[in-house]
Amino acid sequence: MSIQLNGINCFYGAHQALFDITLDCPQGETLVLLGPSGAGKSSLLRVLNLLEMPRSGTLNIAGNHFDFTKTPSDKAIRDLRRNVGMVFQQYNLWPHLTVQQNLIEAPCRVLGLSKDQALARAEKLLERLRLKPYSDRYPLHLSGGQQQRVAIARALMMEPQVLLFDEPTAALDPEITAQIVSIIRELAETNITQVIVTHEVEVARKTASRVVYMENGHIVEQGDASCFTEPQTEAFKNYLSH
């Protein structure tokens, strides 16, 4: 089992953002978190690499175990983030580094790869994500879709077991959205586990092998992709019809 959450409760000050979240996602699945604004999708995603710290519950992810009755050590959090990559909605590329430099920075510093090893790994990913012509460009000179592909390549440089996406197609036009969907589907063939937050039902339908539908910090429905054609709850049925 690649990801297991049990009884996760998360607060921002006095406001509770997640209520008793329990879910499983086997290795190699693509799990999509769906729901209206304020449902808790991004909070849940951020729990998976401990950008948000729950107040209670347990998390197993990529071989790392956390019991939130105790505060995790800095080393445990670092170990987790080596195995769990994140592609942010705003891309978060380093503006002063070229595409190639963006890719090799973390593997050299964090994984201790030599520059040659990192460059060889980067070369393969630039090829795979159709970014070869842009390797010497700076993020400022790339379109939104190109920046998103660089962000995905950068996360894959760490060879994570789990890859998290926060609204990967937000603000992208339909053609670029189709490219990102295609990349996610290609990655699904490689046995990497993916978790995707989106509010775009079509993106979810095209990528998800499992789906979790949330409202107001609660899981309302979860299951495999058949939920899209046979929703089990009125709430999810209504959401899909809008």
Swiss-Prot record:
Gene Ontology cellular component terms for the protein in this record: ATP-binding cassette (ABC) transporter complex, substrate-binding subunit-containing; membrane; plasma membrane
Species classification: Bacteria, Pseudomonadati, Pseudomonadota, Gammaproteobacteria, Enterobacterales
Listed transmembrane segments: none
Native organism: Escherichia coli (strain K12)
NCBIfam families, sorted: PRK11124.1
Enzyme Commission number(s) from the entry: 7.4.2.1
Keywords carried by this UniProt record: Amino-acid transport, ATP-binding, Cell inner membrane, Cell membrane, Membrane, Nucleotide-binding, Translocase, Transport
Residues that, per the record, bind ATP: 35-42
Record-given protein name: Arginine transport ATP-binding protein ArtP
Family: Belongs to the ABC transporter superfamily.
Quaternary data: The complex is composed of two ATP-binding proteins (ArtP), two transmembrane proteins (ArtM and ArtQ) and two solute-binding proteins (ArtJ and ArtI).
Domain of life: Bacteria
GO MF annotation terms: ATP binding; ATP hydrolysis activity; ATPase-coupled polar amino acid-transporter activity
Function: Part of the ABC transporter complex ArtPIQMJ involved in arginine transport. Probably responsible for energy coupling to the transport system.
Localization (cell): Cell inner membrane
Pfam families assigned to the protein according to its UniProt record, in alphabetical order: ABC_tran
An annotated GO BP: L-arginine import across plasma membrane
Gene assigned in the entry: artP
